[in-house]
Amino acid sequence: MNRLGGLSLPLRPVCLFCRAQTSLALSPLQGGQAVRSIATGRLRRRARMTLSKDVAKSSLKPKRTDRGKLGPFPNMNQTRARVREDPRSRSPAALKRSGETEEKPAMNTESPLYKALKMQTALAPISYGKRTAIKAKIAEITSFDAFTLLPIVRNSIFSQALPGIADAVPTPIQRVAIPRLLEDAPAKKQAKKVDDDEPQYEQYLLAAETGSGKTLAYLIPVIDAIKRQEIQEKEMEKKEEERKVREREENKKNQAFDLEPEIPPPSNAGRPRAIILVPTAELVAQVGAKLKAFAHTVKFRSGIISSNLTPRRIKSTLFNPAGIDILVSTPHLLASIAKTDPYVLSRVSHLVLDEADSLMDRSFLPISTEVISKAAPSLQKLIFCSATIPRSLDSQLRKLYPDIWRLTTPNLHAIPRRVQLGVVDIQKDPYRGNRNLACADVIWSIGKSGAGSDEAGSPWSEPKTKKILVFVNEREEADEVAQFLKSKGIDAHSFNRDSGTRKQEEILAEFTEPAAVPTAEEILLARKQQQRENINIPFVLPERTNRDTERRLDGVKVLVTTDIASRGIDTLALKTVILYHVPHTTIDFIHRLGRLGRMGKRGRAVVLVGKKDRKDVVKEVREVWFGLDS
């Protein structure tokens, strides 16, 4: 019964499919829509603005239709046997199921030397025949007088570059490079027809072992060329002045007046004649100091710019109204200046890339090539200089400069015999894997080994300070190792990128500059001061207690650093290097040990080898590299 009080009839079940058919019959469909199901009763239109997903595809696979499928009786009416010429190789899984074994390639029968020095293949080799030819050539030059240098430049070599060395002779790289760089036009370039795409300047590669005098090898020819250009410009200016005087006299006679004012000559401010590029600010300061020493007698203007200097000082140095002849800079800073002032590179005749293996790697290559291309119109000589020539640099130079002159020495990629290499296994007693303890023990042993030898000479003279350089692989470990050495009574300092600029200069100066010999006045002053302290007990020297010596190591200074100090830094006063870690590559090994044995001096290096370090590499380095002639 419903709400009105009447009886309600039971509901009749309705089929949805029947209702759909009824609705379809009431609205007749057209064409292909009549055969579609209820789910797709109305055809969906394709959107016009929908982008295709197959635009980027080079080719689309055609859909395979039923007609292309093989039937139940394929390949029955064949008149020719289709046999595969090359048998199909079986998969390893099929060989394993059949019980057969795949033929394995023969084991590598190379000697352990090849396996241990696998990273040495990154260095470009120098043939034995070429080494012999170079030795015969450099034996002919015995003094700097054999070079065609200006007298003022030759005299400055002995008084400024190499003071205190009476019998200074050219090093092998200087004997090879200086004569070639002094030439104006080598015969190799004259005989070849110059192409428009090829560089119009000469290219040179100076490659020699560390500490062999490569800086002077390119500085001396560059300074000589700058002075010769200056002499030629003075002669041209003199002739131009004479011509102007004659024109003025003729104008006075003819009573002619100049309608246009004379254009002043272009200023040389911010337009150096030569540029030397180095990778770090420390090398900028070092090369700049060498140039400044030459400038005292040769008389030319030089300047340095780096990130350690203020913008005001950089501007005053580069854009000095008096002009600048030689500029030392880093590539990134010079490239940024050249973008705002392109005329900076408009007068460059000599461009030097020191530490070329760094300046031509991935990080510096775009900037270095940009500077070279902007200086190309006026460039006369492009010089690359490096102690290591990786295969990447070698192939890059062959690609960019196929006609480059390669000036190398016989001992390239070698550590001379005058450097002794020792190995300390930190896994043995008493260290038991403690690398910090092993490093401190080695430093104490070195500091105590020669104690008393310097003190016996004079009671008034201070003992000679021993300087030790410790190399670590990570920047963070430099501070940690230095703090540990200080806790063991060792005067240690850390040197890395995080150190302040002034602190870096002070620390680095102690290890790069040799100690000055005290004068007679300084010795007399120290003697009087010590006599005043001991006036109550005359003629008796104070006895040294053992309290301080037990807790402190006197007469030793240690610098803990990374690879920032391994390239180009002239550590002539250094005699000991400790490798806290085994270097990652052969190139790092060479540059770290290259802080020793510079300019013919002796040195010793100690490598701390742990459980995870490559002991075989260190062993083969001792046997191979130290076997070459020094």
UniProtKB/Swiss-Prot annotation:
Q: What does this protein do?
A: ATP-binding RNA helicase involved in mitochondrial RNA metabolism. Required for maintenance of mitochondrial DNA.
All copies of the Helicase C-terminal domain together span: 452-630
Q: Offer a single GO CC term for the protein.
A: mitochondrion
Transit peptide endpoints, chain numbering: 1-46
What is the species of this protein? Emericella nidulans (strain FGSC A4 / ATCC 38163 / CBS 112.46 / NRRL 194 / M139)
Which UniProt keyword terms apply here? ATP-binding, Helicase, Hydrolase, Mitochondrion, Nucleotide-binding, RNA-binding, Transit peptide
Q: What class of enzyme is it?
A: hydrolase
Predominant location: mitochondrion
GO: which molecular function terms? Answer: ATP binding; ATP hydrolysis activity; RNA binding; RNA helicase activity
What InterPro entries does the record point to?
A: DEAD/DEAH_box_helicase_dom, Helicase_ATP-bd, Helicase_C-like, P-loop_NTPase
Residue ranges of the motif DEAD box: 354-357
What's one Pfam family the UniProt record gives for this protein?
Helicase_C
What PROSITE patterns does the record point to?
HELICASE_ATP_BIND_1, HELICASE_CTER
**Superkingdom of this entry's organism?**
Eukaryota
PANTHER family documented for this protein: DEAD-BOX ATP-DEPENDENT RNA HELICASE 50
In this protein, which residues make up the domain named Helicase ATP-binding?
Answer: 195-407
Motif interval(s): Q motif: 167-174
Q: Where is this region: Disordered?
A: 46-108, 235-265
- Coiled-coil ranges per the record? none
Provide the protein name: ATP-dependent RNA helicase mrh4, mitochondrial
User: What's a GO biological-process term for it?
Assistant: maturation of LSU-rRNA from tricistronic rRNA transcript (SSU-rRNA, 5.8S rRNA, LSU-rRNA)
The family note in this entry says: Belongs to the DEAD box helicase family. MRH4 subfamily.
- Where found? Mitochondrion
Name the reaction it catalyses.
ATP + H2O = ADP + phosphate + H(+)
Sequence ranges of Basic and acidic residues compositional bias: 235-255
- Entry EC no(s): 3.6.4.13
Where do the annotations place ATP binding? 208-215
